[in-house]
Amino acid sequence: MKIISCKSIIVSSLLALSATATAGSFNDISWTLENEDNLPETDASGCALKPSTSTSTSKTFEFGLTDDSNCLDGKQRDEFKYQRRTGYNRLTGYFTIDGNYSDFNKMGVAQTHDHSTSDTGVFSIYQVRKENGSYIFGVQGDSNYSNNGWSDHPQVKISLDTRYELIIKTNGLPNGNSYEDANLYLDDVKIWSSSIEVGGEEKQYKKIGAYQLTGGEGEFHVKWDSVKLYTGK
């Protein structure tokens, strides 16, 4: 698996992009901003505070699995969940991982779900893993599809205390035909791209925040800002 160094970010990014298979196309899609029509709610099993204003889609959110956030006591997630959507939908936003909590591994920052993710459906976890002292960003998809495992997708080295833009585009279709594309940017330069072949139900929802994966450990704090949701046609 090609791991990209931020020192050669532009050249290496092209190599990673060429290694990505495309499950479907998002060309010529017209996107409409949802604004207050898709406000986030607290994940029922998490400990994030529900936003209280209609401008929450553009606010800055802090998520943490830390000793001082009361999210390590039997909680493995601190996330916001957006409403279900069918067809074309898109999430854009910027995340920054707090370098004060650097001793972590296997933490998710964004996800796409339908309600039966353990068996079928869109199930993508955009995550950061610590490998040999480096922080690696990548994705794993629905485990029913062998080409959607973590090691089968491009990965890129990222830095803590650095603001990255993540754009996730999904087309929720029936009969196992759904698909998703995602891109990661640093200073408006695309450094990573991947596609998920997911199948499953057409109604899905996006999540952002801090999520401890199986085998994950350590304290983790991430900030999201300028989060926007779109529908497409």
From Swiss-Prot:
Q: Which family does it belong to?
A: Belongs to the polysaccharide lyase 7 family.
The signal peptide here is: 1-23
User: What is the enzyme's main class?
Assistant: lyase
The Gene Ontology terms for molecular function here are: poly(beta-D-mannuronate) lyase activity
Coiled-coil ranges per UniProt: none
- Protein name (record): Alginate lyase
Give yes or no: UniProt keyword Metal-binding. Answer: no
Establish whether keyword Nucleus is in the entry: no
The Gene Ontology CC terms held by the record are: extracellular region
Task: Tell me which UniProt keywords the record has, alphabetically.
Answer: Lyase, Secreted, Signal
EC number, UniProt record: 4.2.2.3
Q: Upper taxonomic classification of the species?
A: Bacteria, Pseudomonadati, Pseudomonadota, Gammaproteobacteria, Pseudomonadales
Catalytic activity field: Eliminative cleavage of alginate to give oligosaccharides with 4-deoxy-alpha-L-erythro-hex-4-enuronosyl groups at their non-reducing ends and beta-D-mannuronate at their reducing end
Location in or out of the cell: Secreted
